[in-house]
């Protein structure tokens, strides 16, 4: 029996992980128990086991063929988890690499996951830039508000393509500065 699979996406620094974790906390109180899975963490585990990286941020710099192989292995692992319970997959719709945008959910991953819903968490490029600059825990490439906006546009395009390929609905959720509670409430409602 197929359990519900939801994909939650957003550019680095938008707060998709934080807002979705808080929504999952709300849902647990209601007896709705998703398993939260970070696609990046599963990819990192696989890449680290293969001695390809030592920190998560290095994964963006792997050559595309290696990234594709790691994505496929991670997708297979998560698909196995989804057989046990509903799953929310925290990931990126696209990954900005030195050679261009890499789909975060290429066909071989989509075929494994077959999501029911794809959520894109967004805010303005300026807000994301400020969040990134104040986050000393991560090593991030320097971007401008304009390149962040372009990345978010690519995420929307990719999310709709994923929806076309799988029949999943696509939901855009705004996570503006100072309005986290609103984003969490919207996520909680759509995940019920």
Swiss-Prot record:
Residues where ATP binds: 10-18
Temperature dependence: Active from 30 to 40 degrees Celsius.
Enzyme Commission number, as recorded: 2.7.4.3
Highest taxon, organism lineage: Archaea
Alphabetized GO MF terms: adenylate kinase activity; ATP binding
Subcellular location: Cytoplasm
Quaternary structure, from the entry: Monomer.
Protein family (similarity comment): Belongs to the archaeal adenylate kinase family.
Protein name: Adenylate kinase
Gene encoding the protein: adkA
């Amino acid at each position: 029996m197929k359990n519900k699979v939801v994909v939650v996406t957003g550019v680095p620094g938008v707060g998709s992980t934080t807002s979705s974790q808080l929504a999952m906390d709300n849902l647990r109180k209601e007896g709705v128990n998703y398993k939260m899975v970070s696609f990046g963490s599963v990819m990192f585990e696989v890449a680290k086991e293969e001695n390809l990286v030592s920190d998560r941020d290095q994964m963006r710099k792997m050559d595309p063929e290696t990234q594709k192989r790691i994505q496929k292995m991670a997708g297979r692992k998560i698909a196995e988890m989804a057989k046990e319970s509903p799953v929310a997959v925290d990931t990126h719709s696209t990954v900005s690499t030195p050679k261009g945008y890499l789909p975060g959910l290429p066909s071989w991953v989509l075929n494994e996951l077959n999501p029911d819903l794809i959520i894109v968490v967004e805010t303005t490029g300026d807000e994301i830039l400020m969040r990134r600059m104040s986050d000393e825990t991560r090593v991030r490439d320097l971007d401008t508000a304009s390149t962040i906006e372009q990345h978010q546009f690519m995420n929307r395009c990719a999310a709709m393509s994923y929806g076309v390929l799988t029949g999943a609905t696509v939901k855009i959720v705004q996570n503006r500065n100072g309005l986290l509670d609103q984003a969490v409430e919207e996520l909680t409602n759509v995940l019920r």
